[in-house]
Amino acid sequence: MLRLLTSVFLISSAGIASAQGKNDGWLDLLGDNLSAWKEPYGDWQQIAGVELDAKLPRKFLAKDGKGVWYNGPKGNARNLFSRQNFGDVEIHFEFNIPKGSNSGIKFHGHYEIQILDSFGKKNLTGDDCGGIYPRAELKPRYMHIDKGIAPKLNACKAPGDWQTLDVVFLAPRFDKEGKKIKNAMIAQAMLNGQVIHNKQELMTPTGDRWKNAEMREGPLMVQADHGPVAFRNMKVRAIK
């Protein structure tokens, strides 16, 4: 495991330069179409950019063109699930949210790193931007049963500013009988260039998925039904 972690950090340190230069195994998830994701897509739209609505700062004004994908004028589209499954994986993307908005990226569809307008907040929990989302119960009503894992610091930018998230995720390990012998891990996560998680074990999945069976591989999921969010330059690379 130590050798794997060392390799992961070497990959991570060079990863973004590679993503922006040579392909080096990186897969572009948001190109000219959404073919990397399972249908249906709902109200996802390709645009040139977004800006805050001066009259309604919880909404975006979209600019015609290409290069950015957002979840439509209502801020409520289908969650995206990747066609490809991943085990150990590295992801880089840029995101933009208006005031009060909420999204997230889930590894294996189970382990969520939160995307939220947490600009200026001092007392952080896993429900804040970059946090590892709290576990939750659905009944009798949706409620958190813990605080999740807070980011090490608040690196969240102001609503309307483009932000970057870089994550190295290591899948759980299982023996020949299928018994888990190693927890999943966020080997490293960086929000806007600042380390927010380092070698953070994930004892269970997050949110209401925490009781679900864990897997060697699973899809990436992008949450799109909790308010406006825009993405660009989303790239993923499997770690061998």
For each predicted feature, which ranges?
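Sec-dependent N-terminal signal peptides
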Residues: 4-13
